Amino acid sequence: MSRGIKTAERLQMQKTKWKKEHIFALVVACIPLLGFIIFNGFPLIISFIGMFCNVDLYDLTNIQWNNFEGFKSVFIPRHAYDLFYFDLAKYFYKAVIITVWIASTQLVTLLVALFIATLLHEKPNGAKLFQILFFIPYICSTVAVSLMWRWILDWEGGILNSLLGTDIRWLEDPKTITWCIIIAIIWQAPGYGIVMYKAAFSNINSALYEAAEIDGANAWHKFWNVTIPGIAPTTFYLLQAGVAAGLLTYDLAALIIPDAWGSVGGVESMGLTLIRLVRYLIANSTTTDMNGISYMVSCACVISWLLFLVTGVLSMILFRQREKSAE
């Protein structure tokens, strides 16, 4: 009888202890969740409302329905729908082209990373040193990288012009502005991919290479039929992360190609990305049309949600392709 009472008391104490630990765990888990709601969830709701309403950033109680003026301003050219002192639609479509162009270069960085990782996987002399050297650009500050490339590409005393013996204005010529941003990205981005691919190579079963060699496969066949399928999950992850980073390019573009006088995104806006356009609209949120109404915040919300949806859809497509390749 006493043994049963003691057992019941022990179980009750364990339940009480578990309940206390459970409550403590929930409290700890809710701390980052609360931060997410405040700093991500709330702005997300405000931006969604801002697509359809005029929102005053300094007074969120002042919200008025805008009859889809934000959508009209973004997608309809100036000659058809004139709201601002500049053609927002023209800037938007140019920013779309440049952003897609920059995002597509992630494929190049992926190929560069794969090529270098393949060479390093053969373990040449100094492989560890080269791996560190290739990774350094990735961990460098974006500000430092941007200043370095501005110094290299400067038309007056820049290293590139000194080597070529020319005086080309790389950072001011509309034909070369976007290429300056792309070159900087290709220089900085592959380091992370190299490390990831090196780890992926190590996880491939060596027995597969031995079996392929027994079957008479040459180096190319082993690479295509063994290595590529083995690193497919890593490739899809890097592609997904790279495309998202490309679509959200801002700091590198803004620092290498600052806004020109009377133009956003450098000369002829050839350094303008969608995120830079959003930043410009928010910074000029007090600018009004001929009726004294500002649609800048609404337009910024429209572009932000467009980027969000495009990035989400592309990520879902790549995720499904990754699952299919794993089957």
Cite the ranges covered by each PLM segment.
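A structural signal for multi-pass alpha-helical bundles of membrane permease subunits
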Residues: T16-E327
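Short, Lys/Arg-rich, polar N-terminal cytosolic tail immediately upstream
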Residues: M1-K19
